[in-house]
Amino acid sequence: MTQESYDYANRHGLRPISWNDFHGLCQAIALAAAEFKPEIIIALGRGGFYPGTLIAHLLRTEIYPVRLSRRVNDVVVYDDPVWLLDPPALVQGKRVLMVDEICDSGQTLQVAVEKLVAMEVAAVKTAVLYSHTWGANIPDTIGLITDALLLNPWDREAVVDGRIQFHSEYVSAFAQQGIPLEDTLRIPATKFELAKRP
């Protein structure tokens, strides 16, 4: 099945992910990844930085960021993923766990794995927090398979006109599915006054 990335009209339902859900998914992935004994974790940014960092802490493994994306400044600008930050040369000869947030088409993971294989890693495995059904055959490890619209705790809000508001991409996705925009879907964060600011 061919599926357009970011086509939110084809999502079925809504799945808010809490910070507790995120932590539990990362724990499950870390336990599975421990059997592989990764020497390095490569986190695909931006979304993969969150799970990659927690999984690296759980496994007490070194982590390195890479940027392979269709997006620049949160806007889709490329038809195919483009390398913005390559993996480090020190991956050569190492067992690498590549971590991303989601597998949609699978193209980003495939391009990244091809690059690591070309860099002569000893072995590479992939892990994602989530996959849609049409991409589930790509990652080695998946925390959750769903075709729902996923609301991550780290990207559902953005600063707009000096205020924290729903991210515009989610607002559009809600509209495409006919889902009402409700404050209950926002992150119930504690409000802080800064101790110091410039």
Language-model-detected regions and their locations in the chain:
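PRPP-dependent phosphoribosyltransferase catalytic core
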Residues: T2-A9, E114-P198
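Short, glycine/charge-rich flexible loops or terminal/linker lids adjacent to PRPP-binding catalytic cores
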Residues: L58-V96, S105-V113
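Conserved acidic residues
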Residues: E39, K94, P139
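Glycine-rich phosphate-binding loop signature in dinucleotide/nucleotide-binding domains
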Residues: A33-K37, L90-Q92, E120
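Active-site-facing substrate-recognition patch
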Residues: M1-K37
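A structural signal for isolated positions on well-ordered beta-strands in alpha/beta enzyme cores
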Residues: I40, Y64, L97, K125-A127
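Short glycine-rich phosphate-binding loop at a beta-alpha junction
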Residues: K37-G45
